[in-house]
């Protein structure tokens, strides 16, 4: 059996209870060593086989899974954040499906949630944004033409940009090209979300690249942009005294 487990954004205590329990009983852990906090490996049994997938190819990862399955062992494939976002798990699951190897998925806390917590921010504010766009800048891995950053930026929604801090100058240019954001639109960067060395940088879209370079941030950071970081919004209807819900009669009745 293979268990795909989300490790969370960094802090070891942000892994789910289910994920921690699976690590404790695993016979083999294959972890994304470039981003997963190695402190989580302290949950492993003394005789657990541990592999760092940052040093492996997909074929090598799958070979380990096959060997463990043939021996009747439990494998945990430990991915950073939540594996459903930029986790490269589909290509693993398709092979497991084809070979009849059972597996399941345990979600984790994504770094974009951790970034909001670090900023004490809410991505969806009434009259500001009810949409969150999660994307990345095109680099060595291309993006579909219709998903170019400038096209997505045209919506003016809350933007969360993964895997792009090394291209921050191009990110800033694309955000402004979209037309909905101005140089004064609030933005922020969160480095190593929830790790001890976490750092937040607040800026605007117009000063994004300059601020990132000044902070010396070159990797392992999220970029967020949008009016949700500003001061203006309307209170929610849900807790408005005049608003009737299934559980409470409002003054509008």
Regions found by a protein language model. Name each.
Residues 1-109, 114:
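Class I S-adenosyl-L-methionine
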Residues 2, 60, 71-75, 131, ...:
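A contiguous loop/helix-start segment that scaffolds small-molecule binding in enzyme catalytic cores
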Residues 12-13, 38, 83-84, 107, ...:
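Flexible, active-site-adjacent loop/turn segments at secondary-structure boundaries
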Residues 13-18, 37-38, 62-63, 120-121, ...:
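A generic local structural motif
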Residues 20, 42, 67, 124-125, ...:
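Short secondary-structure boundary/capping segments
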Residues 43-44, 63-64, 116-120, 136-137, ...:
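Short secondary-structure transition/capping segments
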Residues 84-155, 199-202:
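Class I SAM-dependent methyltransferase SAM-binding "motif I" and its flanking Rossmann-like core
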